[in-house]
């Protein structure tokens, strides 16, 4: 297997790794129930109904 001809500098190594960092998912607090939810997504409440933007969009099955 070939080896590098020149040593990679700290700057080049760190610039390459600059995109490797992980970001935590965004979390919002539901206004009515106070539970933690992902924003811009529908979620199932404790009663089994679907909620979006604080409004019930589907009844429990």
Swiss-Prot record:
GO molecular function, one term: structural constituent of ribosome
Listed GO CC annotations: large ribosomal subunit
Keyword Ribosomal protein on entry: yes
Biased composition (Basic residues): 1-16
Source superkingdom: Bacteria
Spans annotated as Disordered: 1-47
Ranges annotated as biased composition (Basic and acidic residues): 29-38
Keywords assigned: Ribonucleoprotein, Ribosomal protein
Record family assignment: Belongs to the bacterial ribosomal protein bL32 family.
Protein name, entry field: Large ribosomal subunit protein bL32
Species annotation: Bdellovibrio bacteriovorus (strain ATCC 15356 / DSM 50701 / NCIMB 9529 / HD100)
Gene from which this protein is expressed: rpmF
